[in-house]
Curated annotation (Swiss-Prot):
Chief subcellular location: nucleus
Disordered as annotated region, ranges: 423-515
Source organism: Scheffersomyces stipitis (strain ATCC 58785 / CBS 6054 / NBRC 10063 / NRRL Y-11545) (Yeast)
Record-given protein name: Nucleolar protein 58
Composition bias type Acidic residues, residue spans: 438-448
GO BP terms, alphabetized: box C/D sno(s)RNA 3'-end processing; endonucleolytic cleavage in 5'-ETS of tricistronic rRNA transcript (SSU-rRNA, 5.8S rRNA, LSU-rRNA); endonucleolytic cleavage in ITS1 to separate SSU-rRNA from 5.8S rRNA and LSU-rRNA from tricistronic rRNA transcript (SSU-rRNA, 5.8S rRNA, LSU-rRNA); endonucleolytic cleavage to generate mature 5'-end of SSU-rRNA from (SSU-rRNA, 5.8S rRNA, LSU-rRNA); protein localization to nucleolus; snoRNA guided rRNA 2'-O-methylation
Family, as annotated: Belongs to the NOP5/NOP56 family.
Keyword Ribonucleoprotein found: yes
Gene Ontology terms, MF aspect: snoRNA binding; snRNA binding
Amino acid sequence: MAYVLTETAAGYALLKASDKKIHKSSSLIEDLNTADKVAEQFKIHRFEKFQSAANALEEANAVIEGRVSDSLKKMLEDAKSDKKATLIVSEAKLGNAINKLGLNFSVVSDAASLDLHRAIREFLPELLPGLDDSMLKQMSLGLAHSIGRHKLKFSADKVDTMIVQAIALLDDLDKELNTYAMRCKEWYGWHFPELAKMIVDSVAYARIILTMGVRSNASETDLSEILPEELEEQVKSAAEVSMGTEITAIDLENIRALAEQIVDFAAYREQLSNYLSSRMKAIAPNLTALVGELVGARLIAHAGSLTSLAKAPASTIQILGAEKALFRALKTKHDTPKYGLLYHASLVGQASGKNKGKIARVLAAKAAVALRYDSLAEERDDSGDFGLEVRAKVESRLSALEGRDLRTTSKVVREQPKVDITEARAYNADADAPTAEVDSDDESDTEEIDTKKEKKEKKEKKEKKDKKRKREDDDEEEEDKKSKKEKKEKKEKKEKKEKKEKKDKKDKKSKKEKK
């Protein structure tokens, strides 16, 4: 007796085959090319209808994952007989799961069974009474959409893929902007070299090129929208006595095209930064309040998704982004890194060198809690109050370690202060003055402090050297042990070989003497 288990959008169908060895006969399967032949070969034995669309999705996911659902198990238990029967299934994982149930079925799932299922599905409406072709197609389409939505887990408000792409694009834009700005300054520098020393901001530099053109137009050009009044006068006066060479109209046209690219890229970068900030506040408000938009976005991008990052422990979040250093340290048996991407967080930046590792550990622990709150909480809270509360605790811990009061942040997402474009500072030699005479008591105190520092540094250097020497000695001892072991093994092999050869010679000699 042979049964065929077919999963449809309407329910599970268990078909009984007239030939129990149909799955072994390729000629019989090839003959199933018409509805009459399929109907003649298979009869409906049992049909377990799905209760709703949600139930259909649940059952379909169970089949995809290779699990036997309760309804399928019940149907198979009702269908089993005393005699052992063959059950043909299309999914190998599902077949293995049915085998583990211990039912009286010999489960088959191979290439021939796939061809058999293909023929059955083509003429399925003829086998299932009460289901026409159009209804079955409509059910299949609805189930396909449900499975697609389930796999994508799409939500318009919570798409961390947007963050991953936005932060990657932001990094690429920064690299491109730096490259373009460098080329622009080098190119226009042949015509007006003094301008690069006075204007540090690349976007302002590009806007001056677009507004002014050649340096001879400086006196007639209004740069008040770009530069402060004092700096504008300095640029105009420098243009009159510039040492740069003259450039043609074609040169200026190409330089202007590059300057336009820089201005456009800078405007788009600002727009993208605002977009990333709004996305981070919508998706992970508490993480944003704790570590900031950029660090939070880089953590999510590195982990792949917000859910993956939320599932990670605090120790993983702490060193996320420092995987190369971690594996190198483990390989060489050195100290493992204390922080990865969290190093760029403002709270870690406020800590002194000796406390950075401690604060990174505390921040990682709090970030893990904030991430789980953002990703897995039953009730959404977009205000980020929990993140601000946790940040205050980290700040109090930092102030306790540093032994000084730190400025508390009412707003974590700080607005960037407006940068005044000023002339680059030059060294003023006239401001130099001879050092004042210091009292002997003060000198002795400073000398004592210096000697203590020198002793401490020498002690630390000595300890580091001792540790390094000890590691090298340990490595040498291990190598010596290995070489001795190898020599011993070679010697034993040689002795065994010699003994065997002697034994063989004796045997040959004894055989000759007998003859």
